[in-house]
């Protein structure tokens, strides 16, 4: 149960792989209470922001999943993506919040791309031994269940999941003052853009 500003909402999510997200988003000074009636996991994202805006509840229907890259790059970069809030949805926020579900053995954040705003990924897998690879610039880190990847602004950051496993990623971006992240700001590495027109 979420409680904020005299409002109350009951939220349930069996798991991140089959059901959509619930989120209460508020500005500095908003008191949000969470009452768990069963064992639960809550992800808290926060940053400094002096702007005032009204708190809002986002339900699963507010952040529908949409497939990306179906049929492209040999059909191995398929993933479902949602955006819970970004600059277009909540222009006074200093954050972006969304989710990705990689199909088994597929890539996300592909083609390799960068943006000046820093980003954090939080990973979950549909089996506890599941794993993937998180590329941050020229470094590669093993992604495991409930691990995270901290991506400095300006670094390329594609991700991949091992065959047989589905990977969930909660992606969180912090706007730069005067330079918010926008959906149109995706800057792909020019070395790989030829793949858009390649046939496999």
Which positions does each model-derived feature cover?
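Generic detection of short hydrophobic beta-strand segments and adjacent strand-loop junctions
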Residues: 9-11, 141-144
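Short, structured patches in soluble enzyme cores that scaffold and shape functional sites
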Residues: 28, 36, 44-48, 85-87, ...
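Conserved metal-binding segment of the jelly-roll/cupin
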Residues: 17-37, 47, 142-164, 170-174
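Secondary-structure boundary elements
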Residues: 33-39, 91, 126-130, 139
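A short glycine-rich, His/Asp/Glu-containing loop-to-beta-strand
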Residues: 71-120, 131
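Acidic, low-complexity central loop/insert segments
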Residues: 2-63
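Short, conserved beta-strand element in jelly-roll/cupin
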Residues: 1-4, 100-104, 115-143, 150, ...
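Double-stranded beta-helix
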Residues: 39-80, 96, 135, 170-200
